[in-house]
């Protein structure tokens, strides 16, 4: 049977003009109260795309007031039928489909994503996610409980209230949709702070939210820096929940701020150093490709990157050879250009961090198989890099690199590799490649990770809960559990004259 044909990918928009650079509050566009703006950089060219209004605490306060007003008892949003909330989310998905090429172009230009990926993956996944959450809107319900005594008892799942949502730069559109979709389906109101590197798709989505017909104040977007706008959200006394995707270091600060303020609910999806284990009986071609994509996709800028690759001793040399051969096939350049398969890192800081970790690998004795340096003279590009003979104590084996760098380590036994795989403060994801069903179940059960992929990698789905163990965070996004993260569970017990079964 032949595989289905890939859908046609249109050309990106030429000379895209950025329409929305202001703060979005109450369905209106505002200048920052401090009068400041910040530059948004194209990471492939290092040129300024535009300047965006820089929100800080005062702007967050303004957005919170709007969101709180929209959440008041008796407001249009609170009295709206749940099914109508779903209709609004579906309308937003339709508008995204209409403007899909524009969104993909913007995501590629601002976030450095390969345009084909931005069109076929980022926008497609986002549209499907919105439709998924739309379907949940009128299916969030409680239970009746046969409690003791002459009492009628039931539970209600109610929206938490005003939610702060802090978006990372590595998936600005997808994470925007994952967060607002779950929150809005339950009836919450939101203040979104996109990453300062990548605010453009969030601001454009704000215009579509208004066009779709969401009431004023339901969705507010405040671009700004983490140390100001992000900190204001985390510590705000009138925000009921904060959801953050980003580094473990910042996640700790957010949880601390939530605890020191009003003990707001917190969902964190943080860093990872995910193990990928390849046993000798695995389908070698498939394992090489999945492991490769697991660490090189989007220039390695993915939280679930398969950044600790454990390969069984008997196939190690051949696996390394094939991995190097695969890494050398990349064509680097502007991600908007056709034929390009690797784009830039997000900014100068991340670029320097990756190169520093590559140098540490060389100095600590890992064998550099290919790559190992900067590519080109302009843009934040890093050569696809593969290290072999990596040991567990090396920095490249312990620290999150967030770049196109593959570390390949050797193991001898199942007990050894499980112990080594779990020897990390992180626990976001893991991969296992084997044809032995018993081994697959044994290893996947033993791994301390929120998601374990068997004979595949990066197969995320909006229907499935996603989140981390240990220092990779707490709470879940997507799936039924991801929806319930945006609800409070209330028990109501009524005294009645007589209870009958």
UniProtKB/Swiss-Prot annotation:
Site residues (Transition state stabilizer), renumbered to this chain: 170
Catalytic residues of the enzyme: 269, 303
Keywords carried by this UniProt record: Acetylation, Cytoplasm, NAD, Oxidoreductase, Phosphoprotein
Chain positions found as N6-acetyllysine: 91, 128, 252, 353, 367, 410, 419, 435, 495
Catalysed conversion reaction: an aldehyde + NAD(+) + H2O = a carboxylate + NADH + 2 H(+)
Superkingdom of origin: Eukaryota
Family label: Belongs to the aldehyde dehydrogenase family.
Physiological role: Can oxidize benzaldehyde, propionaldehyde and acetaldehyde. No detectable activity with retinal.
Induction: By phenobarbital.
Keyword Ribosomal protein: no
Pathway the protein acts in: Alcohol metabolism; ethanol degradation; acetate from ethanol: step 2/2
Principal localisation: cytoplasm
Name the UniProt record assigns to this protein: Aldehyde dehydrogenase, cytosolic 1
Modification type Phosphoserine: residues: 413
Gene Ontology CC entries for this record: cytoplasm
EC code: 1.2.1.3
Location(s), subcellular: Cytoplasm
